[in-house]
């Protein structure tokens, strides 16, 4: 399981960014937005491979931004909190676990994919031209607690 998680969550994003980055570097501009996680900043419980892959994502974002910012690329990330998707269905369907998670989220609700529209558009736009190596959390306030 460890290898599969690292392959999907870290290696695939690195390989894709390397390939896309080649063209962007030739053109002298581009924006890469990585998918991080709350576990980019926290250790998590029972998910060491996932936590390690997302912790490494933070370092990858910073390393690539250090290399490519001066060449016209912006490298940033989005860190989703607890979002109502297929991946979180079991958590949402467990009343006790869901209550404990929602109690920690200041907005008191699960996020939705629509919650990413603004942050992703911002990072993809010229409004973020001076941002590099940053990760925006979209978590209903989870990390503020």
Tell where the protein language model's regions lie, with residue ranges.
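Substrate-binding pocket helix/loop in short-chain dehydrogenase/reductase
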Residues: 1-6, 101
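Active-site helix of classical SDR
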Residues: 17, 53
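Residue(s) in the substrate-gating loop at a strand-loop-helix junction
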Residues: 37
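Short C-terminal tail/terminal secondary-structure segment
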Residues: 42, 120-121, 132-145
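Active-site loop-to-helix junction immediately N-terminal to the catalytic Tyr of the SDR YXXXK motif
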Residues: 42-51, 63
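Short, small/polar-rich loop/turn modules that mediate ligand/substrate recognition or access, typified
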Residues: 69, 74, 131-133
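A conserved structural motif in NAD(P)-dependent oxidoreductases
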Residues: 105-116, 127
């Amino acid at each position: 399981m460890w290898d599969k998680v690292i392959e999907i969550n870290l290696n695939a994003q690195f390989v894709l960014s390397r390939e896309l980055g080649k063209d962007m570097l030739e053109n002298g501009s581009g924006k890469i937005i990585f998918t991080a996680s709350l576990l980019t900043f926290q250790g998590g419980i029972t998910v060491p491979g996932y936590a390690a892959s997302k912790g490494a994502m933070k370092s990858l974002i910073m390393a690539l931004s250090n290399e490519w910012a001066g060449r016209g690329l912006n490298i940033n990330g989005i860190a989703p909190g607890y979002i109502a998707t297929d991946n979180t269905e079991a958590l949402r369907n467990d009343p006790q676990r869901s209550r404990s998670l929602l109690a920690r989220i200041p907005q008191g609700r699960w996020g939705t994919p629509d919650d990413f529209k603004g942050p992703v558009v911002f990072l993809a736009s010229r409004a973020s031209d001076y941002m590099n190596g940053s990760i925006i959390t979209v978590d209903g306030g989870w990390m503020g607690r």
